[in-house]
Amino acid sequence: MSDKYYRSTYVNVDLNAIVANFQVFQKLHPNKTVMPVVKANGYGLGSIKVARQLMDNGAEFFAVATLDEAIELRMHGIDAKILVLGVIPTEHINKAIQHRVAITVPSKSWLVEAVKEIPESNEKDLWIHVKLDTGMGRLGMKTAEEYKEVIELINGHSHLIFEGVFTHFACADEPGDSMNRQQTMFEEIVGQADKPDYIHSQNSAGALMKDTQFCNAVRVGISLYGYYPSAYVKSNVKVHLKPSAQWISEIVQTKLLHAGESVSYGSVYTADEKTKIGVIPVGYADGYPRMMKGFSVNVNGKQCEVIGKVCMDQTIIKIPDEIQVGDKVIIMDHHSDTPQSAEALAHQQQTINYEVLCRLSRRLPRVYHSSKDLEIRNELLK
Protein backbone atom coordinates (compact mmCIF):
# COMPACT_ATOMS: atom_id res chain seq x y z
CA MET A 1 0.00 0.00 0.00
CA SER A 2 1.30 3.47 -0.86
CA ASP A 3 2.34 5.88 1.89
CA LYS A 4 0.15 8.50 0.18
CA TYR A 5 -3.07 6.70 1.03
CA TYR A 6 -4.03 4.27 3.74
CA ARG A 7 -6.94 2.23 2.44
CA SER A 8 -7.23 -0.66 0.03
CA THR A 9 -9.09 1.06 -2.78
CA TYR A 10 -8.18 3.62 -5.41
CA VAL A 11 -8.94 4.79 -8.95
CA ASN A 12 -6.38 4.34 -11.71
CA VAL A 13 -6.48 7.21 -14.22
CA ASP A 14 -4.76 6.68 -17.57
CA LEU A 15 -3.62 10.14 -18.66
CA ASN A 16 -2.20 8.73 -21.88
CA ALA A 17 -5.69 7.52 -22.81
CA ILE A 18 -7.14 10.98 -22.15
CA VAL A 19 -4.51 12.58 -24.38
CA ALA A 20 -5.21 9.99 -27.08
CA ASN A 21 -8.93 10.79 -26.94
CA PHE A 22 -8.17 14.52 -27.15
CA GLN A 23 -6.09 13.84 -30.25
CA VAL A 24 -8.93 11.82 -31.78
CA PHE A 25 -11.09 14.95 -31.72
CA GLN A 26 -8.26 17.09 -33.05
CA LYS A 27 -8.09 14.76 -36.05
CA LEU A 28 -11.88 14.72 -36.45
CA HIS A 29 -11.98 18.53 -36.38
CA PRO A 30 -8.55 19.64 -37.64
CA ASN A 31 -9.44 23.29 -38.18
CA LYS A 32 -11.26 23.81 -34.89
CA THR A 33 -10.34 24.48 -31.29
CA VAL A 34 -10.98 21.36 -29.23
CA MET A 35 -12.16 22.59 -25.84
CA PRO A 36 -11.75 19.96 -23.08
CA VAL A 37 -14.54 20.11 -20.51
CA VAL A 38 -13.04 19.49 -17.07
CA LYS A 39 -16.03 20.39 -14.90
CA ALA A 40 -17.12 18.22 -11.95
CA ASN A 41 -13.48 17.57 -11.08
CA GLY A 42 -12.76 16.36 -14.58
CA TYR A 43 -15.80 14.06 -14.57
CA GLY A 44 -14.57 12.60 -11.32
CA LEU A 45 -11.03 11.88 -12.50
CA GLY A 46 -9.23 15.04 -11.40
CA SER A 47 -9.48 18.36 -13.22
CA ILE A 48 -6.02 19.63 -12.26
CA LYS A 49 -4.06 16.60 -13.46
CA VAL A 50 -6.18 16.24 -16.59
CA ALA A 51 -5.83 19.92 -17.51
CA ARG A 52 -2.07 19.91 -16.96
CA GLN A 53 -1.61 16.81 -19.08
CA LEU A 54 -3.72 18.25 -21.88
CA MET A 55 -1.95 21.62 -21.76
CA ASP A 56 1.32 19.76 -22.25
CA ASN A 57 -0.27 18.22 -25.34
CA GLY A 58 -1.64 21.33 -26.98
CA ALA A 59 -4.92 22.19 -25.24
CA GLU A 60 -5.46 25.95 -25.19
CA PHE A 61 -9.03 26.43 -23.94
CA PHE A 62 -10.86 24.62 -21.12
CA ALA A 63 -14.50 24.69 -20.03
CA VAL A 64 -15.89 24.30 -16.51
CA ALA A 65 -19.32 24.72 -14.93
CA THR A 66 -18.63 27.18 -12.12
CA LEU A 67 -16.39 30.11 -11.29
CA ASP A 68 -15.03 28.17 -8.32
CA GLU A 69 -13.84 25.43 -10.68
CA ALA A 70 -12.17 28.02 -12.90
CA ILE A 71 -10.39 29.67 -9.97
CA GLU A 72 -9.21 26.25 -8.77
CA LEU A 73 -7.54 25.71 -12.14
CA ARG A 74 -5.90 29.13 -11.94
CA MET A 75 -4.68 28.46 -8.38
CA HIS A 76 -2.92 25.36 -9.67
CA GLY A 77 -1.14 27.08 -12.53
CA ILE A 78 -3.50 26.44 -15.43
CA ASP A 79 -2.98 29.60 -17.49
CA ALA A 80 -4.88 28.58 -20.63
CA LYS A 81 -8.20 30.16 -21.54
CA ILE A 82 -11.10 29.03 -19.34
CA LEU A 83 -14.83 29.40 -20.00
CA VAL A 84 -17.43 29.07 -17.24
CA LEU A 85 -20.47 27.42 -18.85
CA GLY A 86 -22.84 28.13 -15.98
CA VAL A 87 -24.26 31.38 -14.63
CA ILE A 88 -22.05 33.39 -12.29
CA PRO A 89 -23.83 35.44 -9.60
CA THR A 90 -23.47 39.01 -10.83
CA GLU A 91 -21.96 40.17 -7.53
CA HIS A 92 -18.93 37.95 -8.23
CA ILE A 93 -18.24 39.20 -11.74
CA ASN A 94 -15.05 40.97 -10.65
CA LYS A 95 -13.60 37.64 -9.53
CA ALA A 96 -13.93 36.44 -13.12
CA ILE A 97 -12.13 39.57 -14.30
CA GLN A 98 -9.42 39.12 -11.67
CA HIS A 99 -8.74 35.52 -12.69
CA ARG A 100 -8.99 36.12 -16.46
CA VAL A 101 -11.97 33.79 -16.84
CA ALA A 102 -14.43 33.96 -19.73
CA ILE A 103 -18.06 33.98 -18.62
CA THR A 104 -21.40 32.94 -20.05
CA VAL A 105 -24.09 35.57 -20.60
CA PRO A 106 -27.51 33.86 -20.51
CA SER A 107 -29.71 36.93 -20.95
CA LYS A 108 -29.77 40.68 -21.47
CA SER A 109 -31.13 41.28 -17.97
CA TRP A 110 -28.25 39.33 -16.43
CA LEU A 111 -25.67 41.35 -18.35
CA VAL A 112 -27.29 44.66 -17.34
CA GLU A 113 -26.97 43.70 -13.67
CA ALA A 114 -23.44 42.32 -14.09
CA VAL A 115 -22.14 45.51 -15.69
CA LYS A 116 -23.32 47.49 -12.66
CA GLU A 117 -20.88 45.48 -10.53
CA ILE A 118 -17.83 46.46 -12.57
CA PRO A 119 -16.18 49.55 -11.03
CA GLU A 120 -15.38 52.52 -13.25
CA SER A 121 -11.75 52.20 -12.21
CA ASN A 122 -11.52 48.71 -13.73
CA GLU A 123 -8.92 48.48 -16.48
CA LYS A 124 -9.05 44.74 -17.19
CA ASP A 125 -11.08 43.03 -19.90
CA LEU A 126 -13.89 40.55 -19.35
CA TRP A 127 -14.32 37.91 -22.05
CA ILE A 128 -17.91 36.98 -22.82
CA HIS A 129 -19.53 33.98 -24.51
CA VAL A 130 -23.22 34.51 -25.25
CA LYS A 131 -25.45 31.47 -24.69
CA LEU A 132 -28.32 30.78 -27.10
CA ASP A 133 -31.17 28.44 -26.19
CA THR A 134 -32.01 26.62 -29.42
CA GLY A 135 -33.96 23.76 -27.88
CA MET A 136 -32.36 22.62 -24.65
CA GLY A 137 -34.77 24.81 -22.69
CA ARG A 138 -32.15 25.56 -20.09
CA LEU A 139 -29.77 28.56 -20.06
CA GLY A 140 -29.62 31.10 -22.83
CA MET A 141 -31.63 33.56 -24.89
CA LYS A 142 -34.08 32.40 -27.55
CA THR A 143 -34.42 35.31 -29.98
CA ALA A 144 -32.20 37.11 -32.45
CA GLU A 145 -33.51 40.41 -31.09
CA GLU A 146 -32.21 39.76 -27.58
CA TYR A 147 -28.95 38.41 -28.99
CA LYS A 148 -28.33 41.60 -30.97
CA GLU A 149 -29.23 43.77 -27.99
CA VAL A 150 -26.72 41.88 -25.84
CA ILE A 151 -23.98 42.34 -28.44
CA GLU A 152 -24.79 46.06 -28.56
CA LEU A 153 -24.40 46.27 -24.78
CA ILE A 154 -21.09 44.42 -24.94
CA ASN A 155 -19.73 46.63 -27.71
CA GLY A 156 -20.76 49.71 -25.75
CA HIS A 157 -18.52 48.84 -22.81
CA SER A 158 -14.79 49.46 -23.18
CA HIS A 159 -13.70 46.39 -21.22
CA LEU A 160 -16.24 43.79 -22.36
CA ILE A 161 -14.95 41.52 -25.11
CA PHE A 162 -17.42 39.54 -27.24
CA GLU A 163 -15.27 36.43 -27.53
CA GLY A 164 -17.77 33.68 -28.28
CA VAL A 165 -21.29 32.43 -28.85
CA PHE A 166 -22.57 28.92 -28.22
CA THR A 167 -25.53 26.62 -27.76
CA HIS A 168 -26.03 23.12 -26.39
CA PHE A 169 -27.66 20.15 -28.10
CA ALA A 170 -30.46 18.38 -26.23
CA CYS A 171 -30.65 15.11 -28.21
CA ALA A 172 -27.33 14.73 -30.02
CA ASP A 173 -26.88 11.25 -28.53
CA GLU A 174 -30.24 9.98 -29.82
CA PRO A 175 -31.72 9.24 -33.27
CA GLY A 176 -33.79 11.96 -34.89
CA ASP A 177 -33.39 15.40 -36.43
CA SER A 178 -33.28 17.48 -33.24
CA MET A 179 -29.58 18.27 -33.50
CA ASN A 180 -29.90 19.49 -37.09
CA ARG A 181 -32.86 21.69 -36.17
CA GLN A 182 -30.95 23.24 -33.31
CA GLN A 183 -27.89 23.83 -35.47
CA THR A 184 -30.02 25.54 -38.13
CA MET A 185 -31.61 27.84 -35.54
CA PHE A 186 -28.18 28.59 -34.06
CA GLU A 187 -26.74 29.56 -37.43
CA GLU A 188 -29.76 31.73 -38.25
CA ILE A 189 -29.44 33.74 -35.04
CA VAL A 190 -25.65 34.03 -35.05
CA GLY A 191 -25.69 35.08 -38.70
CA GLN A 192 -27.60 38.26 -37.84
CA ALA A 193 -24.63 39.94 -36.15
CA ASP A 194 -20.86 40.15 -36.34
CA LYS A 195 -19.23 36.83 -35.52
CA PRO A 196 -16.96 36.48 -32.48
CA ASP A 197 -13.69 34.54 -32.33
CA TYR A 198 -15.28 31.32 -31.03
CA ILE A 199 -18.50 29.74 -32.30
CA HIS A 200 -19.37 26.38 -30.74
CA SER A 201 -22.38 24.11 -30.57
CA GLN A 202 -21.05 20.54 -30.55
CA ASN A 203 -20.73 18.54 -27.36
CA SER A 204 -19.16 15.05 -27.33
CA ALA A 205 -22.08 13.46 -29.17
CA GLY A 206 -22.32 16.31 -31.64
CA ALA A 207 -18.59 16.26 -32.30
CA LEU A 208 -18.67 12.51 -32.93
CA MET A 209 -21.84 12.46 -35.04
CA LYS A 210 -21.74 15.69 -37.03
CA ASP A 211 -19.35 18.19 -38.56
CA THR A 212 -20.29 21.77 -39.26
CA GLN A 213 -18.17 24.36 -41.01
CA PHE A 214 -20.14 27.13 -39.33
CA CYS A 215 -18.48 26.46 -35.96
CA ASN A 216 -14.78 26.73 -35.20
CA ALA A 217 -14.69 25.03 -31.79
CA VAL A 218 -16.05 21.87 -30.18
CA ARG A 219 -16.59 21.10 -26.49
CA VAL A 220 -15.58 17.57 -25.51
CA GLY A 221 -16.66 16.25 -22.12
CA ILE A 222 -17.48 12.58 -21.49
CA SER A 223 -15.67 11.35 -24.59
CA LEU A 224 -12.46 13.10 -23.56
CA TYR A 225 -12.28 10.49 -20.81
CA GLY A 226 -12.92 7.63 -23.22
CA TYR A 227 -16.66 7.08 -22.91
CA TYR A 228 -19.36 7.30 -25.57
CA PRO A 229 -22.35 9.54 -24.74
CA SER A 230 -24.76 6.70 -25.52
CA ALA A 231 -24.98 3.25 -27.06
CA TYR A 232 -26.59 4.88 -30.10
CA VAL A 233 -23.55 7.09 -30.67
CA LYS A 234 -21.13 4.22 -30.13
CA SER A 235 -22.90 2.05 -32.70
CA ASN A 236 -23.06 4.83 -35.29
CA VAL A 237 -19.49 6.12 -35.34
CA LYS A 238 -16.20 4.57 -36.40
CA VAL A 239 -14.20 6.28 -33.70
CA HIS A 240 -12.25 4.34 -31.09
CA LEU A 241 -12.12 5.91 -27.65
CA LYS A 242 -9.96 4.68 -24.78
CA PRO A 243 -11.67 4.49 -21.36
CA SER A 244 -9.36 6.08 -18.82
CA ALA A 245 -10.61 4.99 -15.38
CA GLN A 246 -10.29 1.75 -13.44
CA TRP A 247 -11.55 1.36 -9.87
CA ILE A 248 -9.56 -1.15 -7.82
CA SER A 249 -9.98 -2.58 -4.33
CA GLU A 250 -9.10 -5.80 -2.50
CA ILE A 251 -10.55 -8.40 -0.18
CA VAL A 252 -9.95 -7.35 3.45
CA GLN A 253 -11.71 -10.25 5.19
CA THR A 254 -13.20 -13.62 4.30
CA LYS A 255 -15.49 -15.85 6.34
CA LEU A 256 -17.89 -18.75 6.03
CA LEU A 257 -21.63 -18.37 6.37
CA HIS A 258 -23.62 -21.38 7.45
CA ALA A 259 -27.08 -22.08 6.08
CA GLY A 260 -29.54 -19.67 7.69
CA GLU A 261 -26.97 -16.97 8.50
CA SER A 262 -27.44 -13.47 7.06
CA VAL A 263 -25.27 -10.49 6.11
CA SER A 264 -25.51 -6.69 6.12
CA TYR A 265 -28.28 -4.30 7.12
CA GLY A 266 -31.80 -5.67 7.11
CA SER A 267 -30.48 -9.23 6.73
CA VAL A 268 -31.87 -9.25 3.20
CA TYR A 269 -29.40 -11.95 2.14
CA THR A 270 -29.56 -15.29 3.96
CA ALA A 271 -27.35 -18.20 2.96
CA ASP A 272 -29.20 -21.38 1.99
CA GLU A 273 -25.99 -23.41 2.22
CA LYS A 274 -22.43 -23.00 3.46
CA THR A 275 -21.14 -19.92 1.61
CA LYS A 276 -17.78 -18.14 1.56
CA ILE A 277 -17.99 -14.37 1.56
CA GLY A 278 -15.51 -11.53 1.19
CA VAL A 279 -15.59 -7.96 2.42
CA ILE A 280 -14.44 -5.08 0.19
CA PRO A 281 -13.67 -1.64 1.73
CA VAL A 282 -15.92 0.19 -0.74
CA GLY A 283 -19.40 1.60 -0.16
CA TYR A 284 -21.92 4.17 -1.21
CA ALA A 285 -19.84 6.98 0.31
CA ASP A 286 -17.26 6.15 -2.35
CA GLY A 287 -19.78 6.23 -5.19
CA TYR A 288 -20.88 2.58 -5.16
CA PRO A 289 -24.62 2.91 -4.43
CA ARG A 290 -26.91 0.52 -2.59
CA MET A 291 -28.60 -0.55 -5.81
CA MET A 292 -25.43 -2.47 -6.76
CA LYS A 293 -26.75 -5.44 -4.76
CA GLY A 294 -26.98 -8.34 -7.20
CA PHE A 295 -24.28 -6.93 -9.48
CA SER A 296 -20.80 -8.45 -9.62
CA VAL A 297 -17.16 -7.51 -9.20
CA ASN A 298 -14.13 -9.16 -10.76
CA VAL A 299 -11.83 -11.01 -8.35
CA ASN A 300 -8.90 -12.75 -10.02
CA GLY A 301 -10.90 -13.08 -13.22
CA LYS A 302 -13.96 -14.52 -11.50
CA GLN A 303 -17.34 -12.77 -11.34
CA CYS A 304 -18.40 -12.49 -7.70
CA GLU A 305 -21.92 -11.41 -6.76
CA VAL A 306 -22.60 -8.47 -4.46
CA ILE A 307 -24.86 -9.79 -1.68
CA GLY A 308 -26.76 -7.94 1.02
CA LYS A 309 -27.12 -4.19 1.12
CA VAL A 310 -24.12 -2.10 0.13
CA CYS A 311 -23.00 -0.20 3.24
CA MET A 312 -21.56 3.29 3.49
CA ASP A 313 -17.98 2.02 3.59
CA GLN A 314 -18.08 -1.71 2.84
CA THR A 315 -19.57 -4.20 0.42
CA ILE A 316 -19.98 -7.96 0.83
CA ILE A 317 -19.56 -10.43 -2.02
CA LYS A 318 -19.99 -14.17 -2.48
CA ILE A 319 -16.63 -15.75 -3.38
CA PRO A 320 -15.25 -19.17 -4.38
CA ASP A 321 -13.04 -21.07 -1.95
CA GLU A 322 -9.74 -20.05 -3.56
CA ILE A 323 -10.25 -16.29 -3.07
CA GLN A 324 -8.20 -14.97 -0.15
CA VAL A 325 -7.57 -11.76 1.80
CA GLY A 326 -5.49 -9.36 -0.29
CA ASP A 327 -6.80 -10.54 -3.65
CA LYS A 328 -7.37 -7.74 -6.16
CA VAL A 329 -10.93 -6.65 -6.91
CA ILE A 330 -11.98 -4.73 -10.02
CA ILE A 331 -14.98 -2.57 -9.17
CA MET A 332 -15.02 -0.66 -12.48
CA ASP A 333 -12.93 -1.75 -15.44
CA HIS A 334 -11.18 0.40 -18.02
CA HIS A 335 -12.41 -1.80 -20.87
CA SER A 336 -15.77 -1.05 -22.45
CA ASP A 337 -16.76 -4.66 -23.16
CA THR A 338 -16.46 -6.19 -19.69
CA PRO A 339 -19.11 -6.86 -17.01
CA GLN A 340 -17.56 -4.07 -14.90
CA SER A 341 -17.50 -1.37 -17.58
CA ALA A 342 -18.77 2.10 -16.69
CA GLU A 343 -21.73 1.42 -18.96
CA ALA A 344 -22.55 -1.84 -17.17
CA LEU A 345 -22.41 -0.09 -13.81
CA ALA A 346 -24.63 2.68 -15.19
CA HIS A 347 -27.19 0.15 -16.39
CA GLN A 348 -27.33 -1.44 -12.94
CA GLN A 349 -27.71 2.00 -11.35
CA GLN A 350 -30.41 3.02 -13.86
CA THR A 351 -28.34 6.01 -14.92
CA ILE A 352 -25.64 7.03 -17.43
CA ASN A 353 -21.88 6.60 -17.49
CA TYR A 354 -21.46 10.33 -16.81
CA GLU A 355 -23.01 9.92 -13.38
CA VAL A 356 -21.00 6.80 -12.56
CA LEU A 357 -17.79 8.78 -13.05
CA CYS A 358 -19.01 11.92 -11.29
CA ARG A 359 -20.06 9.85 -8.27
CA LEU A 360 -16.48 8.78 -7.58
CA SER A 361 -15.90 10.23 -4.13
CA ARG A 362 -13.08 12.61 -3.27
CA ARG A 363 -11.98 10.15 -0.58
CA LEU A 364 -10.91 7.70 -3.29
CA PRO A 365 -7.22 8.25 -4.06
CA ARG A 366 -6.46 8.77 -7.75
CA VAL A 367 -3.38 7.09 -9.18
CA TYR A 368 -2.30 8.85 -12.37
CA HIS A 369 -0.42 6.93 -15.04
CA SER A 370 1.36 8.71 -17.89
CA SER A 371 4.26 8.05 -20.21
CA LYS A 372 6.44 10.15 -17.90
CA ASP A 373 5.60 8.97 -14.41
CA LEU A 374 3.10 7.69 -11.87
CA GLU A 375 1.58 10.14 -9.41
CA ILE A 376 -0.80 9.61 -6.51
CA ARG A 377 -3.25 12.32 -5.49
CA ASN A 378 -5.15 11.94 -2.23
CA GLU A 379 -7.66 14.79 -1.77
CA LEU A 380 -7.96 14.04 1.95
CA LEU A 381 -4.25 14.42 2.66
CA LYS A 382 -3.16 17.06 0.15
UniProtKB/Swiss-Prot annotation:
CDD domains: PLPDE_III_AR (cd00430). The active site is at 39 (proton acceptor), 265 (proton acceptor). Its cofactor is pyridoxal 5'-phosphate. SMART domains: Ala_racemase_C (SM01005). Pathway: Amino-acid biosynthesis; D-alanine biosynthesis; D-alanine from L-alanine: step 1/1. One of its GO terms (biological process) is peptidoglycan biosynthetic process. Its EC number is 5.1.1.1. Keywords: Isomerase, Pyridoxal phosphate. It is an enzyme of class 5 (isomerase). InterPro entries: Ala_racemase, Ala_racemase/Decarboxylase_C, Ala_racemase_C, Ala_racemase_N, Ala_racemase_pyridoxalP-BS, PLP-binding_barrel. Belongs to the alanine racemase family. NCBIfam families: alr. This is Alanine racemase. It comes from Staphylococcus saprophyticus subsp. saprophyticus (strain ATCC 15305 / DSM 20229 / NCIMB 8711 / NCTC 7292 / S-41). The lineage of its organism: Bacteria, Bacillati, Bacillota, Bacilli, Bacillales. The gene is alr.
